[in-house]
Amino acid sequence: MAGAAAFVEADNAEEIMARIETKSQKIESLLKHYKHVEALKTALDGSPPKTLDERCKSANWIVVHRAIMAIKDIEGMLNSLTAEYYDILMKYLYRGLSTGDEPTCEQCLMIHEKLTERAGLGCILRCLSDTTNTV
Amino acid sequence: MAVVDVHRFAESITCHAWSPDLSMVALCPNNTEVHIYKSLSQDHWERLHVLQKHDQIVSGIDWSSKSNKIVTVSHDRNSYVWSLEGAEWVPTLVILRLNRAALCVQWSPKENKFAVGSGAKTVCICYYEQENNWWVSKLIRKRHESSVTSVAWHPNNVLLATTSTDGKCRVFSTFIKGVDTKDSKAGSPAETKFGEQILQLDLSYSWAFGVKWSPSGNTLAYVGHSSMIYFVDDVGPSPLAQSVAFRDLPLRDVLFISEKMVIGVGYDSNPMVFAADDTGIWSFIRYIGEKKAASSGSSYSSQFSEAFGKFYGSQSKSTTANDASDSRGGVHDNSITSIVPLGKGGSPKVMRFSTSALCRMSSPDNNHRNECYISTNLK
């Protein structure tokens, strides 16, 4: 904890890309089975915030985006999401809002409203102030 | 039972400190002066002194309890030590050798030194040189990458914790030959070299504020601007750190009211209580004001919430002044910038504390509370 942060992720960008590939396949299959929440959780898991590689971040974003757009029941989804996911989900929501693409923004805004109710302003704060771990 | 006394001294209070007998309070009403008020009765305060020496806003005040000296630091890069001679406060300039504003100050537990955090990425440790009748400042120039927002002394009078806007909390040794005596059972040689960094904590990704040591010096607590509060137990070669994320707006300052309970104050205008349970896990308990306790969803779960609910369910809050308290249910209208204990420094438990806030109906308030573990009489 103190001092150098342990880089659990492999520094190798290729390895991360490969992992994202397998993740996206898993998510596709989960979505086919209407397991939307599972899909989102899988997408958010292992998000590579510590890599500086833009490609990895973009690749992961595409996967998360897919899962976010598939969500229909927001309340239910947030009910089954545990607290650790709130912060990372919020970061992806802001990334979604920054795209300016209408359906994405609409979906992201709806989730944002509900998520803020649950997680509070602190969650947004953590998103905004964290410039080292961006998504 | 938490009882709150509210006193309005000014539009906005930058910082404040209490006299040793708690009858007087020195505060900066967001200008270049320090006003000292004496309490004549429950609600009646009389302004006794106005200390005017600084050219810019006074950013830190500390009043030593044994030697009865006030130290003030200001954005004008100066510091004055005020001594009461007769009925007047006489200032002594302390040349800090800073080229940026001084942000915070604290007397050491033995009151023979004081530490000043500054925007010049340095910490000044000032001590009194008897031969020259002069306060000398020694700078810790290394390590800090940005402004030092807060300083806190360990009970052993040598270790100093600092927080900075680079997000890190550091512990330094401020051993000064001639002022500090080498403790025979003291730690490593690093602890006896001035300016030596003992520990650096890299828990926060954003600005860090408000560091404090627990009464025994075993635990450190500080806050990050990302609505997080960090607790570090067993500060030393292998510390145990915990990050607690909470729902609402960030905190600015914290106070240990006992070894296992911390009050945080900040942008929510409502002090928050954090406590450690028996296993040593810290978590958010509740707000002090009449506000529904936040869900423990965002902080790691605690078994305490229910127990506290029973004790504080019948809380009655009486305010003496009439503020338009907003929907948050707190007494302050705007963000609270500092929290100061009322009582002898170094005592293991704090029964009362005061908070001061910015702008619009800001006021320091005394908050009396009964510790729920031990039944003691209110002072």
From Swiss-Prot, chain A:
Gene Ontology MF annotations: actin binding
Name listed for the protein in its UniProt record: Actin-related protein 2/3 complex subunit 5B
Key words, A-Z: Actin-binding, Cell projection, Cytoplasm, Cytoskeleton
GO cellular component: Arp2/3 protein complex; cell projection; cytoplasm
Record lineage: Eukaryota, Viridiplantae, Streptophyta, Embryophyta, Tracheophyta
Entries under InterPro entries matching the protein: ARPC5, ARPC5_sf
Gene3D superfamilies per record: Actin-related protein 2/3 complex subunit 5
SUPFAM superfamilies: Arp2/3 complex 16 kDa subunit ARPC5
Subcellular localization(s) per the UniProt record: Cytoplasm, Cytoskeleton; Cell projection
Matches recorded under Pfam families: P16-Arc
Family: Belongs to the ARPC5 family.
PANTHER family per the UniProt record, alphabetical: ARP2/3 COMPLEX 16 KD SUBUNIT P16-ARC
Subunit annotation: Component of the Arp2/3 complex composed of ARP2, ARP3, ARPC1/p41-ARC, ARPC2/p34-ARC, ARPC3/p21-ARC, ARPC4/p20-ARC and ARPC5/p16-ARC.
Any one biological process term the GO annotation gives: Arp2/3 complex-mediated actin nucleation
Role, per record: Functions as a component of the Arp2/3 complex which is involved in regulation of actin polymerization and together with an activating nucleation-promoting factor (NPF) mediates the formation of branched actin networks. Arp2/3 complex plays a critical role in the control of cell morphogenesis via the modulation of cell polarity development.
